[in-house]
Structure formats: structure tokens, C-alpha cells
């Protein structure tokens, strides 16, 4: 099998440039627009209202343009029960935004030639060689059963990056494959143990046929461990987090001082699957990290600068371009499961939603062509818009109220951009 490293990435970058949407000139704010600070005042009245209504405990909003903070404010409480005000050093569970960090770490290994996009996952996790699709049928008694069906081709590293591996989540949707994920989180396990559990669950569909949100990034985290000879956190800490100054971004909080800074959700939202105050051996590359607004400002700045920051290159230009290319658009032969899909007008790159067109809404949802974004179950939200030389971060621990908060703030931000 030909190794798809830099040549494959360079080809993808060329395709992106050749197929840029014609609507680019007509959609979104004009390139070079500036944020009108007085219009950003609407963020304060909106978030204060959400806090006062008891819909969220608090939040932090940061907006940067041209390398400088143009808006920063802490709202509400870090811990409502204790009456602790929100502070800049509050630590938040970032849940699925972890996936973007895992993707960046994996692409750093691709840049180095350590792994390749077309490597079969079974090269690093041998048990994946025996995986099958689970296809439902009715038996003679009328009972629904699963038939194992062979894969048309192996799952690859690129499939993990694109959520096209056939690996899904069991906590949404119906069917016997979904039900097979029951009990997958029980007991004590590390990344090696978790992927062996995944290997025993039937795939939901053939690889590269459906964008299906699931445990692909957890499997990718284990690939990083095997390929690097380090734990996932060790590799990320040494190669990405520490060099960027993201010193509070980690999987678990063991230091008493850091644990005291953990942003607590409202009582109604204390049902999420993972709690970063519970220290286990599982470093979930799909949703296990915590972070701060300062760390995410650094991370966003690196992405805004195309994979470099302060003279250090984390991703080569070709690799960054490939990460921010839509790989599941028209002609890719990939359908979309819209549960957890990044939204109308978006495609998907390696770990990020990519704005590819205005979408079907009239007027279009706010944003710019080429913007990259992702968010997590608690409402942590990162948007990087290179056309406007802008990034913004929302930090919150508000599972039930998160979407209204992030969509409203995004509209305020883009409404504030004027030429």
C-alpha cells in the first residue's frame, strides 16, 4: 500500500484551491473587516441575561483580531452552589473539542512520516483486522438479529480523522449496533483496553460511506500511543501543549489548587458521561480533556497562523491546508449522519468543521467561507476565521443551555464585523 504522507496532503491542498466555492465573494463579511467594539457590548447583555435566568452558571468570552484581544469578559459563577465568581483561570471540561487536539497530534505524526493517512488501523491495533459490519435482518421467528459482513476495505487513519470509520457512539440513535455499545464504559481501563472493547463491537457501516460521529478519535489516540511509544498525554504534552504554553490542558486534575478552579455545571446538567474530577486511566482522545481560556487562546492563535506560532511550526503548511479541507463534500461518496454534524453550510476536515458554502438558510447562518470550528458537550466553542484574522472562544459548562449561547454569540460577533 502506498504511504499517503506529504504527496497526498499536497494534492488535497491543490484540490481545495481549485474547487473553492464561487459564492466566496458574496457570502459573509468582506475580507479585512474590522470588529466594531461597541457592537460587541451586546454579548454582555445577552450572557448576563442567560445567567440571571438560571439557564447557565457562567461563561468566559474571548475575541482576538490581528493578534490582540479585542473582547474579554468573565460572566456569572464558576460554582453557583459555593457562590464563587467566574475567574479567568477557571478550568473547563472541553469534551469533544478534545478531538481537534487529538487530530492535530496525529497530523504532526503524519508530517514526520511516522504514520500515514492510508495506513490501516490494524497496523497499530491488530484486533481491528477482524472487524465486521453489523447488518440487521429478521430471523425465522421475526426477531431482529445482526449478520456480520466483511469490510470492503480496511479502516484507515484517514477514516478515523474523518469519522468515516464505521465506529459510532452508542448513546444516540437506535438499533442493534448502537445497543452493542452498552456497558462499554464500565470498569477500569486505559486506551489500550478501550480500543479492544471497540474492536469487539460491530461497525455501523462500511468505511468511507457515512460521516458518523463516534469513538474514532479515541481509537486515533491509541494509534498515537503505539506509533510514538508514549501515552497520548505524554506525546501531546511534549510536542504540542507545553511548547504552546497550554499548561492546564490535560486529561485529569489531580492538583488540589487546579481542582478548586474547576467550573461546575448547574445541578440539572450534572449527568454528563465523564467528569474530569474523577481520575481514571482512560485518556479519551475523543472527549476527555480540560482546559482554560488562556490555553485555548494560544491554541486558536496557532491555528489562525496556519500551524505556527512564535517561530515554531506545529503543522506544515500543506498539512494545515489538508486539515482545513472538506473531505466529505460532493463527489466524495460520503453521506452524512446529521446528528452532531457541524451544521448547515459546513463540510468536515481532519478534526474540524469547515465552512464550505452559505448553506440553505436565508439569510445564511453567520460565518465566513473557510472558517474552522468545533464545540463540545458543555458548550466550549472555538472559531478560527483566517479571512478576518480573528478567533473567538466561549468557555462554559452548560450542557443544556450551550447551543443558544454559542449561536447567539457567533451572530453578535459576525454582525460586529464591518469594512
Positions of the model-derived regions?
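N-terminal secretory signal peptides that target proteins for export/translocation
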Residues: 1-4
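Bacterial N-terminal signal peptides
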Residues: 8-20
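Boundary at the C-terminal end of the N-terminal hydrophobic targeting segment
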Residues: 22-26
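Short, conserved catalytic-motif segment at the N-terminal edge
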Residues: 31-94, 114-116, 130-139, 272-274, ...
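Active-site SXXK
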Residues: 41-48, 61, 67, 93-124, ...
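Short, surface-exposed loop or secondary-structure junction motifs
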Residues: 126-366
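Short, well-ordered beta-strand elements
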Residues: 381-385, 389-398
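Surface-exposed amphipathic alpha-helical segments
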Residues: 406-419
